[in-house]
């Protein structure tokens, strides 16, 4: 068993379910405490101390803190590499917190999303600390982030204090962070270098009608009927309009009507109806502009619905310039000639919006994330650790 596999198995056995998800859907309450990241942060802190690394914590919520582990260079810090996976997972039955090795895979909650990245990044950092290849001028910082799966409070808190915590003044020798800093955000990308991802915007649309007796529907106005026309428009004409906008790495923006609620009982004409919509955005699209666009499109079709944003915190799209020096160096180290894009949203957008150039990279396939049988290829896990270690060793 490799060090990386051993660490991942240990991490899976330390549940860190986001407290926003009390239990897995349809699953009974677990027999032990599984919520919050504190078990993982304490465990990693103990391992970091044994490796002689600097350790700090950033409190985000009571009993929920980002962990910051630093390997300082031999000389003055000239540039910074952040290794930034998240520590929380979605919910799961208790059995998924017992790691299982089968056919070259490790199964368990968080195996690919994203404790595989935690294990690969943390092991690479510890191995670098124990070698003679410590960078001369580059500090390597592991940042284990809390709350990615809900409101990304960990990355939002970190970026607000990044200059104090580990990115000196976001400025080094007169050069801005674009030239001297790179965050590698751990997510399952199948070891592809990702420089762009879509944003996630949740909207609520509401139609209003007039209640009446079901025997005399002509005396009322049916809000569900009006909403049916809105849904049809969103899933046909508006979706087709979005398909005409294309991004070179991300493809098209999308819209999905995921929930609907209207009426009170069959014999009453419904006075109100609401739908919940997931609109995936492209770089350059803002939440306010999307809301205005949908409202204008509905008016043009003579449809009436109130449009509001229900996302608890902004979740914008992200795109990082692949020509930035550290991005190019990472790309060369990986042997990848062109970057990729992904459909999902992650902490990279929060860090990038805060002025820290960010890419996404890690072992595992997003298709396994959040599933009832989450797993990661152990060969890919080890290769991911080696690719990261080789890149870190290549830094000055």
Where are these regions (language model features)?
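Metal-dependent amide/peptide-bond hydrolase catalytic core
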Residues: 202-396
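Glycine/serine-rich anion-binding loops at beta->alpha junctions
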Residues: 105-120, 213, 361
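Acidic-glycine-rich active-site phosphate/pyrophosphate-binding loop
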Residues: 88-102, 180, 195-206
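Residue-level signal for inorganic ion chemistry
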Residues: 11, 15, 48, 187, ...
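Phosphate-handling active-site elements
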Residues: 76, 102, 124-142, 170, ...
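Acidic/His- and Gly-rich active-site-bordering loop/insert found
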Residues: 1-111, 130-136, 365
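Acidic/histidine-rich catalytic neighborhood of metal-dependent amide-processing enzymes
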Residues: 114-115, 119-198, 202, 396
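Short glycine/proline-enriched loop/turn "hinge" motifs that connect secondary-structure elements
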Residues: 91, 134, 194-199, 266-270, ...
């Amino acid at each position: 068993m490799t060090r990386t596999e051993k660490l991942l198995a240990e991490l899976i056995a330390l549940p860190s379910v986001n407290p926003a998800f009390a239990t897995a859907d349809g699953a009974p309450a677990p027999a032990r405490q599984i919520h919050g990241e504190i078990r993982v942060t304490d465990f990693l802190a103990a391992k970091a101390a044994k490796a002689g690394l600097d350790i700090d914590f950033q409190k985000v919520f009571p009993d929920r803190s980002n962990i910051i582990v630093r390997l300082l260079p031999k000389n003055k810090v000239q540039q910074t590499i952040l290794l930034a996976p998240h520590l929380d997972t979605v919910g799961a039955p208790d059995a998924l917190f017992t790691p299982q090795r089968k056919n070259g895979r490790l199964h368990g909650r968080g195996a690919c999303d994203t404790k595989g990245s935690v294990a690969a990044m943390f092991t690479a950092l510890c191995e670098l600390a124990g070698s003679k290849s410590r960078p001369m001028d580059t500090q390597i910082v592991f940042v284990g982030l809390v709350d990615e799966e809900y409101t990304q409070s960990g990355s939002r808190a970190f970026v607000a204090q990044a200059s104090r915590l580990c990115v000196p003044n976001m400025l080094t020798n007169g050069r801005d962070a674009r030239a001297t800093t790179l965050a590698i955000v751990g997510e399952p990308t199948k070891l592809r270098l990702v420089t762009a991802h879509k944003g996630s915007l949740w909207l609520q649309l509401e139609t209003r009608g007039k209640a009446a007796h079901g025997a005399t529907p002509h005396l009322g106005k049916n809000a569900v009927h009006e909403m049916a026309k809105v849904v049809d428009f969103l899933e046909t004409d508006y979706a087709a309009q979005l398909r005409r906008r294309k991004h070179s790495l991300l493809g098209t923006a999308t819209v999905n009507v995921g929930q609907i609620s209207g009426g009170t009982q069959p014999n009453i004409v419904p006075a109100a109806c609401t739908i919940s919509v997931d609109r995936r955005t492209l770089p350059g699209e803002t939440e306010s502009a999307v809301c205005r666009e949908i409202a204008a499109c509905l008016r043009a079709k003579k449809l009436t619905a109130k449009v509001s944003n229900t996302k608890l915190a902004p979740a914008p799209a992200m795109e990082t310039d692949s020509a930035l020096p550290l991005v190019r160096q990472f790309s060369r180290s990986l042997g990848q000639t062109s970057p990729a894009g992904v459909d999902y949203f992650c902490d990279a957008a929060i860090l990038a919006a805060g002025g820290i150039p960010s890419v996404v990279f890690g072992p595992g396939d997003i298709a396994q994330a959040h599933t009832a049988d989450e797993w990661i290829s152990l060969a890919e896990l080890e290769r991911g650790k080696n690719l990261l270690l080789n890149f870190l060793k290549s830094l000055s």
